[in-house]
Amino acid sequence: SPSRGLGDVYKRQIAQAIQNKYAQVQKESIPFMESKKETIRHLEADSLSAAVQSNYILRYSSFPVHENTTAEYFQVGDDMFPVLVRELEQAQHYIYIEYFIINDGVMWRTILDILERKASEGVDVRLIYDGFGCLTTLPYHYDRFLKEKGIQCRIFNPFRPLLNIVQNNRDHRKICVIDGHTGFTGGINLADEYINQKKRFGHWKDTAVMLKGEAVWNMTVMFLHMWNVINNSSEPIDHEIHMPHRFHQEPFAGNGFVQPYSDTPLDGEIVGENVYLNIINRARKYVYICTPYLIIDNEMMTALCLAAKSGVDVRIMTPGIPDKKMVFLLTQSYYEQLLEAGVRIYEYQPGFLPVS
């Protein structure tokens, strides 16, 4: 219909405008996002296949690989939360937070108290939340409430019913950066079910990781890119003041390689899926996957089945108690083909498994 055609054109125009702005801020960061030659040499000596993977990520997401970074893994949000609180309390210069879902409760109130206090002490506190992810969890104009507390706030793609043709463009990232040298990411949103203070669909099993060191730079830049895109700001990012060593003069520890990266659906390159396909295709011993929604395309199905048929131990874990029954039925519809290929599938009986 003519109205649908106009809607499609408008949707493409909006998407292109966002992509153009994102490309602009990415271009400004290029001089500050180059991999260290020494790090690349170390990675190539350690694993040539990992170096090839790393080079692809750099070329198509613009985020380099780093050394001198420690990573602490948290099996559940219950373990991550007290560490996050501890690190927020130690912030002296800036706290940048970007989450899909924020919901009032024990977790958010605890964090908000710290953010308000830190802002009053002169710490630069900024928050991005998704307009749809927080549609039913935060009051309308919550950004104004936060501004009164000294917290700068931006909403990614605020929900507008009359413009629903662009409402599928969402910010699912979960990022917290503290003073440029400490970062949290993973699947955990800022809501009580993620720390099992609120029961929804049984035990809530999600994971997170804390990075300390040079790789946090990638997460800082991710946030600053999004901040400028939402602001539609032409003011360039002050990269120098956000460098990891700016507020951490001592050398960082860490023996491995860390490469945080982001992906966007607007540029035509499916970096995230390609990285997973590379990992699966190069697996020699095992592939273990956790996912709340097993909805895979032909390429992913072929890769998983071929790995299992080749003798790789392929295991997939899905929720025992789903949050969306129709989506779970779709998830289960993929079981037969995977099982026939030798993939082992488990359902997490204690509850929901949003970890990916």
Show the residue positions of the predicted features.
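N-terminal localization/anchoring segments of enzymes in phospholipid and broader phosphate metabolism
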Residues: 1-274, 278, 282, 306, ...
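Short beta->alpha linker loops
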Residues: 79, 106, 295, 349-352
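Helical hairpin unit composed of two closely spaced alpha helices linked by a short loop
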Residues: 293-315, 319, 324
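Active-site proximal loops enriched in glycine and acidic residues that flank catalytic Cys/His/Asp
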Residues: 99, 262, 291-293, 318-321, ...
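C-terminal structural cap/anchor segments
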Residues: 324-356
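Glycine-rich phosphate/pyrophosphate-binding beta-alpha loops
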Residues: 190-193, 292, 331
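A general structural signal for well-ordered alpha-helical packing
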Residues: 273, 280, 301, 314, ...
